Amino acid sequence: TSGKIELNGKEVTFHSPKDAIDMGIGMVHQHFMLIQPFTVTDNIILGVEPVKGLTVDKKTAREKVLELSERYNMKIDPDAKIEDISVGMQQRVEILKVLYRGADVLILDEPTASLTPQEIEGLMEIIQNLTADGKSIILITHKLKEITASSDQCTIIRQGKYIGTVKVADVNENDLAAMMVGRDVNFKVDKKEQEAGEVVLDVKDIHAKDYRGVEILNGLNISVRRGEIVGLAGV
């Protein structure tokens, strides 16, 4: 490897993720690293537990988690178990984890991949709250609408190579797409309507529960015809 990293005008070197965390850089991964039976607070303080005497100071930890949640309008219950909250709320717990450790630079890796449209809107509001408080955000995404809606600058990487950095206000989605793939992109798809054949798969009123007994499929119905493509949308 080669190159250099400067943080607040000073060149720095990281030998481990802990080095980056200690210098104020935190990462929220696409796949969360949370312990499902633990509470929100327990997950956030894991590894950096405040100690009072010979025991973990849960009261102080909970108060700090609640303060951070309220400051950035995350609306998180510090006592809730991870297994009982939504994917969007779990992501907020991951954000709180890095904030609890003092991060000023947050790297969000494909943060909207598993979110509903409403959760995406909530995440964008949280990002705006963070930047208004002086935090810096690196948003890694393939979704151009999110770049144009939330970012000030955009750096494009294609097959691991740096292509360029642009001010988002000066470009549109077509410009960004062309930089990403190296050619003009047509977002309009002309597809002829075709008649599908007979039903080859018919699924009716499927219900299923997870290991906790919580219903995860409720009345699922799918019919697939010969020569037909059926898409499933959801999180």
Question: What would you call each of these model-derived segments?
Answer:
Residues 1-234:
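Glycine-rich phosphate-binding loops of nucleotide-dependent enzymes
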